[in-house]
């Protein structure tokens, strides 16, 4: 089945990777040299993917979880017709389409941003979950409209990371059939021999999770690799194929050592390696025409045929199931139904509720009117109010179910919804306590880097949690999340702000959102609907102002906004001019015009106080050098929530005291 031309193609891919790294004088040649045979076999014999039709919905997804091996992926994208050779010559250079680690939406053919080890593996689980759910929802007899595989190339480092354990456990429990991991098992890590740090039995580990395990003893045996992938595709549940490889294969002096992991070979070793491959070291970035032809006649031909057949199936599906087809097409587009927001609840002045509870009510409506809405909680659904009532749970028997039981696997949960968002067809969300956002912070960061429409629900947002004490009371988390570029961090002050926050989350196509919600009840602010709508979308707005000459600004978010209003009303009775500003979303406020910012925070009013039950970090930008921040510079305490709030100075009396001191 395989011949000398296949070997030439593999060695060409190795050589392209080596040359890109040598020209950049930076990169990781070891993985591309060792893993090229498995990647080549997958792409030419199995992968249903045409880089020139990168948005085809039913394509297979290929994720290079070992993102440091990016030169391999770029070489594959070039020989398959997606990436210009000039881009390989600009590897790791400013403005190129070949950055050091693969970047989503930057290079056609890159499904997700990888590099932080383990996250690609976990995002792949999310992609397989998306495929399973959408298939369960839309497929009908004779119409497997969603039917594709998720393939992962993972390294030893990926499998050492804790997130791989969480994600593998989840995938095994849910028996995600179309998830296949190719494990580049080369017994070397960056620092040296793998047995110095990693000695577990991969077979026993993954079989304990409920995975299938296949061993390929020779990573250069194309038939053995091909047979393993074929076997994996026929099995129930996820499969890991451990492929024993030699890192830096072909390098006479560096193969099998950590010296080839993360540094260029050097000119002398490059020449020796090319001779081992039977290639001319005088030729750089050389691709024989036969190599291009192999990819045209295998991968691209297969992908084009599959896409044409699928398009015909979709046409027939649309005739047989017109309503379902329209829903499916809307899901593929990533758009929201028209007027979905009209179905969301509005709250009057008689309403008092925790923003987590208001969010829970909104979730019920979103699930009803936004069919692509899908997610779950890390074993805190009852507390986060994140489950869809009366809906089925997602599992292997009811993949169409809407409630995902992520279990106590916060990091894997965060990465999984990123994978779902990148997959497409869904508006995914995940929920946990705000203090546990630390467990999934790297996934938040990666969602922002990728510009995904992921929504993270974080409840129990402050010291008002009370009895659970400092381990469960967030302090530094708000500042940490606000520091992430391209992240909506929205802390709503009441039910109406929560409603608009959800609208912002779903409509922010290229920005993830963290919703920071209370456990305790909040009264409804006396502000008209349009003001709230515009104000939350702009990040900050005026919720109360006295008629007197403006003298003081009180800034707050979340539960402290009403406290600020109470203090302002007291100051009003004393004849003071006060404005209260709700600032639910700093990120959005920073994007507003200087004129809008000045209209909210007039520069000639310097007596300012910010009030927030969290670290004061960041607030001084808004209160200025003469202003004050009523925040928290220590950890919380265990006691009834109202008492903790009082002891930490979040009272009307303390606000008035601080105002008088200005």
Swiss-Prot record:
Family stated for the protein in its record: Belongs to the transketolase family.
Top enzyme class: transferase
Positions of substrate binding: 28, 261, 356, 383, 460, 468, 519
Lineage, highest ranks first: Bacteria, Bacillati, Bacillota, Bacilli, Bacillales
SUPFAM superfamilies assigned to the protein according to its UniProt record, in alphabetical order: Thiamin diphosphate-binding fold (THDP-binding), TK C-terminal domain-like
Cofactor: Mg(2+); Ca(2+); Mn(2+); Co(2+)
Classification via Pfam families: Transket_pyr, Transketolase_C_1, Transketolase_N
GO molecular function, one term: transketolase activity
Function per UniProt: Catalyzes the transfer of a two-carbon ketol group from a ketose donor to an aldose acceptor, via a covalent intermediate with the cofactor thiamine pyrophosphate.
Binding-site residues for Mg(2+), renumbered to this chain: 156, 186, 188
Associated pathway: Carbohydrate biosynthesis; Calvin cycle; Carbohydrate degradation; pentose phosphate pathway
Keywords: Calcium, DNA recombination, Magnesium, Metal-binding, Thiamine pyrophosphate, Transferase
Positions marked as site (Important for catalytic activity): 28, 261
Catalysed reactions listed for this entry: D-sedoheptulose 7-phosphate + D-glyceraldehyde 3-phosphate = aldehydo-D-ribose 5-phosphate + D-xylulose 5-phosphate
Active site feature: 410 (proton donor)
The name this protein goes by in its record: Transketolase
The protein's assembly and partners: Homodimer.
Gene Ontology CC: cytosol
EC numbers for this chain: 2.2.1.1
